[in-house]
């Protein structure tokens, strides 16, 4: 028997990251659209004196960076999917991209809140008609971008939607939706300000938008940090795996480690004790019903 190469015992460590994904291409498209609209809104916000419009433009600037990070995460994970220095592949790169997006959302919320408070204390003249037109165009671009990313969001997620979520794509999607929200708030503030002859609604809407964006940021931070810290898999899921192995009457699971290694891919390390232990392959076969278990290591001990 040759030990130089044993393909039947080798494991793939790509975990679904080795091929280009639709989300990668669509994220690049949305990044280009967002960049173009960012330039228009920042320029118009400064020129027309609208804080809501300027806030939306600044918000878009953070999203251009976040979308760029998301696109880079897809490409990096794919290019290094088979790199042996990544012990369990590059599946968590997407979660890391989502975490970076969450941080970007938080920074955007802080910037918008700060500038809105300044504008609330020192109102400025606003060219309402011009600003409204630009805000409407921005909303159309944001909605188109959200549709592009939302289609992929549904396509990639199967089964348990929360557990199989593409956090990188989720982060990009939330950035676009946050842009759409600030565009809507800008339009409401500008139209109301024009009709009422008031400028205070403009920064107030900026404050409202910053609080909503901060809430989204917190949710994404919580979800992605769970993946990065291997704390995402539910107790219920762990119990189901344990029950599947303990179907043998004299077998007990004494140690179980379960964590995510990629979208729709989990890894498990299981230690079992039995008075009549079987080969590790027997226990792996008991777990075959869990199709998202991509890497399983079984440690078998004889009961004393």
Feature roles, as predicted:
Residues 41, 46-50, 195-201:
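Transmembrane helix interruption/hinge and helix-loop junction motifs
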Residues 43-54, 121-129:
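Interfacial helix-loop-helix junctions of multi-pass membrane proteins
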Residues 29-40:
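The first (N-terminal) embedded transmembrane alpha-helix
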Residues 34, 51-55, 170-171:
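Active-site alpha-helix of zinc metalloproteases
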Residues 2-16, 20-23, 58, 66-76, ...:
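Alpha-helical transmembrane segments and adjacent TM-loop junctions that form the membrane-embedded core
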